[in-house]
Amino acid sequence: MISFTLRTEDLSIEEIRKFYVDTQHDRENIEFLKSNVTGLLIGSRGTGKTMLLKVAEKELLEKFELNRTLPVFVSFSSAALVDNEEEKFKKWMLSKILFALQGQLKELGLLKTKNIFSLLLGKESEETDELAIKINQLIDKLEKSWKKGVIDEEPVTPFVEDIDYFKELLHSICTELSIKSIIFLFDEACHNFLPKQQREFFTLFRDLRDPKICCKAAVYPGITSYGTFEAFHDSIVKRVEKDILAEDYVEKMRDIIERQIDSRTYNILVQKGELLDSLIYAATGNPRVLLKSVYEASEKLTSLKKANVNSTLKDFYRTQMWNEYTKLGEKFDAYKEIVDWGRRFIEEKVLVETQNKNARSENEEDYDKQTIYFIIHKDAPELVKKAISILEYSGIVVLHTEGYKIRGNIYNRYQINMGIVATSTSESDLSAYINKLRKGLSIKVITEYGANSVAFKELEQIKNNINLDDGGIDLQTLLSKPIDILDIYEYQKTEIKKEGFCKLIDILKASEMDLQRAYLIGPVRARNIYNLAMNAVLEYIIG
C-alpha cells in the first residue's frame, strides 16, 4: 500500500536527500543552521524543523574535509523519564551530547580508539574504558529514574559534572583532530522535556557558548519555557513557516507530494489540480498537515473526488485540528483556561470578523479582497500573547509579520489557517471556497486588536487562575494512564489487561517476557507493545 512518511525521524539519509524540497526560505534557514552563531529554529508541529536540521547536518558533513566544521545531531527523546533533580539532569544531557559526538567521530572514521577519552591519551587503557562504561551506565540509570529507584550518587567524571571541564574536553578534541568548530543540532530540544527540564536545557544551551562550540535548537512556539535564557537576546531566532503568497508555493508543495509517491499515483492527484490546490492552501504551508489531509481526501491515494475533498476538509479542519488543540488544556492543566480562551477568541471573535470582511457586498470598500489576517498590538496583555503562541504551536494561527506598523502603533500580524477559515463558513463546496479565498487574498485587509481591546476582557478576568510557571505534566500521573491510549489491537489490550497490565507504568515496569504471558502475545508483539508504551509516554508529552 502506498502511503506518505510524515516524520523525518522515520527517513534514512538517502530518503531525506530524495524527499527534501528546497525553497528560498528553507535555504536561508539551512545556511543559518550551518553558521557559527547560536540560534533557535521556531515552528509549529509538522512544519519541517527536523528536515532542515538533517539537511544542514548532511551538507556540513559533505564539506567537512574542506571546512572542518563538525555537525553533531543530538536527540533527547527519553528526557521526560529522567529524574528532574537539576544536577542529575545536567549530567544526563552532557553525557548524551558526549556520546552523540563520539558516535559522529566514529562514523567519520576520525576516532581510531574505542572512545573519546582514549583519543585524548593517545592510547587505549583500562582507565578510559572504565570511564566510558561509567558514563554509559549513568545514562541508563537516569533514563530509568522514573521508576523512583535509588540513583547511585557516586561521582563519574568532571567531564559530565562541570560545564568548564566539558568545554575543555571539546577543545582538546578539536585540537587533536584539527576540527575548526562543532555545531550541536538539538532536535526537539525541549519538545520531549518537562517545563523544569526545558529551563535547565536553556541554561546549558547558553553556558555552552564558545568560539569552538555552537548550538542550534528546534523549538515549538507557545509551550517552551526558556527560564533566564532570553531567546531574542541570547540567540538568533528564525521561523520555518512557508509563505503561502510566494509565487512558487503551490509548485513546491506539490513537489513535496510527488517525491513520496510514484508517477502513476501522482498523476491521479494532479489531474484534479484545483482540488489538490485547495488542500495545499488549506494546509497553510505545513507539510505534515498537507500529506495527512491529501492521504485522507484521496482515499489512501487512490482517487481525488470533490465530495471526498470537501468531507476531509470539514473533518480535518473543523474537528481534528481543534480537537488536538483542545487536548492541550488536558495535557497542560495549568494552561487549560488560557487554551479554552484561545479557542473562543478565534472562533467567536476573529473568525466572525474575518467572515464579515470576506462577505462584503459590491458597494463596500475592498469588496473584492479576501483575508485570513488579524493583528495584535505589541503591548497587549502577556496572557494574550501566550494564548496566541499556543494557537501557533497547534498550527491554527501563524505569525506572519513581526513589528507591523500602522498609524504609529506596532502590531504583530497573524494569519489563520486557511482550512480553519473555510470550515468556519456555511459554504458546502469548501474546495471552491478556498480557491476563491486564496485568489483574492490581501495582507492589507486585517482585523485589528489594540492593546486594550474589549476582546481581551474575559482573559483578564481569569488571569488569576493561570500559573504559567507551573504549566507542566506530572510524569507519575501520566504513567498511571490506562493502556487504552496505546495504538494496538483491542484484543491485545484485553489479553494484556487479563495479566494485570492495566496502566502504562505496569508495562514499563515489566519485561518483555512478562508481557508474553498474555494470550497470543509472542516475542515480537511483546517488544512492539513495550515500545508503544514508551512511545505513548513520550508522544503524549511532546504532542
Where are these regions (language model features)?
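Short acidic, S/G/P-rich loop/turn micro-motifs used as interaction or catalytic elements
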Residues: A80-V82, A189-L194, P381, V398-L399
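Compact, charge-rich alpha-helical regulatory domains located at protein termini
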Residues: I466-G543
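The catalytic "switch" region of P-loop NTPases
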Residues: F159-A282, S428-Y449, I466-I473
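A short, basic N-terminal segment
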Residues: M1-G39, S44, E59-L66
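AAA+ ATPase "lid" subdomain C-terminal helix
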Residues: E296-K305
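C-terminal leucine-rich, beta-strand-based interaction scaffolds used for sensing/assembly
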Residues: S3-T8, V289, N308-T477
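P-loop NTPase nucleotide-binding core
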Residues: V37-K180, P221
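The conserved phosphate-sensing helix
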Residues: A283-V294
